[in-house]
């Protein structure tokens, strides 16, 4: 089959009847073999989906026909294999979970900065640059000079801001995330807390990697994505990272050279934390996956097993939280 089209999308907009969208969208996507995750809430829609180019374009057109979603924006990339195992369309309280009441990006948000103008902003010594993503995302790539809040989930960012940033000291703050959605809420939070000059990267890291040539880039490393590609590089090409099936954290070639790496079972991060029972279960799961692979079958049960048996706090969530 030809390459799959991957579409990352979100829109903060009032969707009072969001619950009624779920079943029709499930039917629409299943009939076109679209896979991925869509989150629906009263505050809008968020998700990443993949399928044939024709199927994804049809879905985007269908979404834009819904009241309030006519201006829905999305970012596209390509995957050589279907990057999702299944389709999930969820009803949520928030489309990206911060856990702070009263934050509405439709009312107030930071100043958008286009990728072409981002380098100049973050090169300003008076600007504090904050990576709003989680620790494991920061580890594999970030912008030069960016601060790592050391969060394990987006819910922890408000506490970091309250304890480490001061409107009287940090006059200019620039924030960025994968696709832009977390910055919508984080900059809205900052504005509510009294920070006056707050900026965020329009379209997120993905748009920057798509538009800014590598030779001019201030991005170091790769960008974690919440699908089976694991990471992408400049030009949105598939990256070099894989997921450890024991803890769901990204691993590279150096990790795989470790004595504590067991394919499909453990990596240096989680090896010492696994119980004998977990190790045995993971080994059996890997055996079944390899058998399915040799038969040309897709072993999709592993993701459910992994989700139940995470051994490390803060493992990546498919929802990007």
UniProtKB/Swiss-Prot annotation:
Biased composition (Basic and acidic residues): 294-308
E.C. numbers: 1.14.-.-
Keywords tagged on the record: Oxidoreductase, tRNA processing
Region named Disordered: 294-321
SMART domains hit by this protein: RHOD
Enzyme type, top EC level: oxidoreductase
Biological process (GO), any one: tRNA modification
Reactions performed catalytically: uridine(34) in tRNA + AH2 + O2 = 5-hydroxyuridine(34) in tRNA + A + H2O
Ubl conjugation listed as a keyword: no
Residue ranges of every copy of the Rhodanese domain listed in the record: 123-217
Gene3D superfamilies listed in its UniProt record: 3.30.70.100, Rhodanese-like domain
Active site: 177
Matches recorded under HAMAP family: TrhO
Protein's job: Catalyzes oxygen-dependent 5-hydroxyuridine (ho5U) modification at position 34 in tRNAs.
NCBIfam families, per database record: PRK00142.1-4
Protein name listed in UniProt: tRNA uridine(34) hydroxylase
Organism: Teredinibacter turnerae (strain ATCC 39867 / T7901)
